[in-house]
């Protein structure tokens, strides 16, 4: 059995988070598992390195799944990116040792928060940042980051 690692990027604004809940098709996990089933005709459960909440985005979410398919990795990534919604992208695919587990082998997580600090709002940044048109108190922000 093969153990496949994915590095995933997604814009989570249309989704209920990472974790599939029942037959909920509004999750990142659910969308990926549906495409994996189309590709392999296997019932596959994908394991994420962590979970994201509703509306949260990811630039490098790692996940893995086990499969018996003999499809080449290059064909897998092409298929997945063709059939996944455009706001979910497989950035990298690798075959891993049997013991690899995305959650248990994770070494860290990085969270980034973006503030659009300008008098004029941005049409492009509005879904990916917090708009704050007033002057920021950088001393208070830095102190908050230390706590």
Language model: regions and residue ranges:
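Structured-RNA-binding interfaces characteristic of tRNA pseudouridine synthases
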Residues: 1-147
């Amino acid at each position: 059995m093969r153990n496949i690692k994915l590095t995933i990027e997604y814009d989570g604004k249309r989704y209920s988070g990472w974790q599939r809940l029942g037959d909920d098709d509004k999750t990142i996990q659910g969308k990926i598992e549906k495409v994996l089933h189309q590709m392999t005709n296997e019932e596959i459960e994908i394991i994420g390195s962590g979970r994201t909440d509703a509306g949260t985005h990811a630039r490098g979410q790692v996940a893995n799944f086990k499969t018996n398919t003999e499809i080449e990795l290059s064909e897998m990534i092409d298929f997945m990116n063709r059939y996944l919604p455009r706001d979910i992208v497989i950035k990298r695919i690798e075959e891993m040792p049997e013991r690899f587990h995305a959650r248990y082998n994770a070494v860290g997580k990085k969270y980034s928060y973006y503030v659009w600090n300008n008098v004029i709002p941005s049409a492009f940044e509005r879904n990916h940042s917090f708009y704050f048109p007033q002057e920021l108190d950088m001393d208070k922000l830095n102190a908050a980051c230390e706590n």
